[in-house]
Amino acid sequence: VEYEVLPHIHTIEEAAAPDAPRVFDEEENNICAYKHISRGNATEAIEGSKYVISQHFETPWTEHAFLEPECAVSFYDEDGDIFIYSTDQSAHQTLHECSLLLGTDKVKVQNALVGGGFGGKEDMTVQHLAALLTYVTKKPVKMKLSRAESLLVHPKRHPFYMDMTMGCDENGNIMGVKAKVKADTGAFASLGGPVLERACTHAAGPYHYQNFEIEGTAYYTNNPPAGAFRGFGVTQTCFATETLLNMMADKVGITPWEIRYRNAIRPGEVLPNGQTVDDSTGLVETLEAVKEKYDAALEAGKAVGLGCAMKNAGVGVGIPDTGRVKLIFEEDRKLHIYSGASCIGQGLGTVLTQMIVTNTDIKREDIV
């Protein structure tokens, strides 16, 4: 085999260099996404703080390692449409992309029981390939990845490189935080942009200080793609914030529990990202509930850790977030639930059934 080694990029430093080869020729540079959030004056607040700590953090690629590998079955149905049984986290996205690929809207997608997902099945893997083979051969097709193929194909958790500075007063109250984060999104965008947005939006943690600034950039490289993974970027920045908070507690001379309790967000207060929290916020009560056992473990010399985190529920960041189902009485005289959400272990079928039974006179045994 004869091949030519093309210019390639494997680090963020290489991707950000002024003369760097571009992963995509049509792009001006290797930046996939950029996010900047600023409230108050973090620089001024940090400069006026009694205690200041700056630290560099790095987190690696992580594999989802779900038990069930990706699989799809496709065939022509009685309507002449290509019907795809899929195991992914977004049936509508699969429908959209397969329709674009095949150049027809005569495509249907139905999600089977997906099994584990954790974000690793957000992107298409075998669905479009099975559909294309059915389109060409007019035959039913099943494609299933082996474990090795699964590890090779689907995106991973983003590696993050973070520089963060925190300032506190003499009592351990956070005065300001400033951060720069860089993410390696690999050779394709996947969900690199939304992951970066979440990472920056929630990096400040569930605390009530008001001087915060973060600048985030996601870069294309020739590495394996990175995409959705539980926590969706917040895991990485939260790790940095919480570690820095532990270091600050040592510097101030108080426990990690105490520094979190003094800074904990309470109902009606405003987070560093500008969101006002509601009455469902229970961080203070949660910390109080573990204090006795935490203190006892410290006194006994046991290794004990403590961490706080927050993340969006649903879409968040101001985007409309609606959920719909279609309910149809079919020929079997049963009520069938049609939902675009995927069964990935969260008990979707059970919850939807419970909602119907609770709000109607329909019996459980009459629902499919």
Pin down the residues of each PLM region.
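Structural alpha/beta core scaffold segments of enzyme domains
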Residues: V1-V368
